[in-house]
Amino acid sequence: MSSLPIDDNRAALYTVGQVAAMLSVQQAFLRRLDEHEVVSPRRSPGGQRRYSRQEITLVQYVVRLTDEGMTLSAIRRILELETELRAAHRRIAELEAELGRTRDDGQASRRRSTR
């Protein structure tokens, strides 16, 4: 059975009005987030913004940061740095796995050579 778009956190399903109502924010605030490239939802064929659940969660985070007094440019930079940090953590995990394989290969070859 195939999954439905509603099951996909990245499916762009919600309009600006729906998201504004869900989060108790103004539609203009959501448009400003897009204009400042903080949260840029996909567009429908008619050009309307459509938000995924993942983007709605991100907007909630942005609302919290703005409530704490952060500017949109500061928030955009925070989001960029968090993305870079996640990528660095993934790369570290890859390198640690590679190091583990290399150590295992080295130990196996030492065992073979001592026989």
Task: Go through each PLM region and give its residues.
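Arg/Lys-rich, alpha-helical DNA-contact motif
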Residues: 2-12, 35, 40, 53-115
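Short alpha-helical "recognition helix" segments of helix-turn-helix
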Residues: 19-20, 75
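Append "Primarily bacterial transcriptional regulators
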Residues: 20, 33, 51
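Short coil turns linking two alpha-helices in DNA-binding domains
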Residues: 26-29
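Beta-hairpin "wing" of winged helix-turn-helix
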Residues: 40-46
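Minor-groove-contacting beta-hairpin "wing" of winged helix-turn-helix DNA-binding domains
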Residues: 47-53
